[in-house]
């Protein structure tokens, strides 16, 4: 893939934007016709797991290196950029499931605790990610404890 082709790739541009902000990324598989591009018919995490040929150690291979990121997307231009959360990038992500449960839980939290602070929001294939500053300490596993359809990622 030529430089001009990669420079117009929105997935590459998203990965580079994260890197510019000090957030380490890695390439993960994408979806083809509703199935994971990894080719496994029974893939347990479609379009959400690292590409082993590019990042064999998964999130431990996440980087902010523009050279590495460009090489990854030259090899796999359809790859989705995944963010290494927690201390590696200084962010915690709240994964809001796109079904009614996730957004209902989010509204209930806002009703109890007030509006969620202004933050970066990214639409995902099945909902939304909200980005918050990493608090400096590892949070205990809170999956499902904030409400149905809400999962913090760090």
For each predicted feature, which ranges?
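Conserved phosphate/metal-binding and DNA-contacting active-site motifs used
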Residues: 1-154
């Amino acid at each position: 893939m030529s430089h001009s082709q990669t420079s117009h790739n929105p997935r590459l541009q998203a990965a580079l934007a994260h890197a510019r902000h000090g957030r380490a990324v890695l390439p993960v598989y994408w979806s083809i016709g509703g199935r994971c591009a990894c080719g496994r018919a029974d893939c347990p995490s479609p379009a959400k797991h690292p590409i082993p040929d590019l990042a064999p150690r998964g999130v431990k291979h996440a980087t902010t290196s523009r050279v590495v990121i460009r090489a990854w997307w030259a090899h796999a231009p359809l790859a989705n950029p995944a963010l290494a959360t927690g201390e590696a990038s200084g962010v915690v992500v709240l994964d809001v499931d796109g079904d009614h449960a996730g957004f209902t839980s989010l509204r209930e939290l806002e009703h109890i605790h007030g509006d969620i602070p202004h933050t970066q929001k990214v639409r995902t294939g099945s909902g939304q990610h909200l980005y918050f500053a990493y608090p400096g300490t590892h949070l205990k596993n809170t999956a499902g404890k904030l409400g149905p359809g809400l999962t913090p990622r760090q």
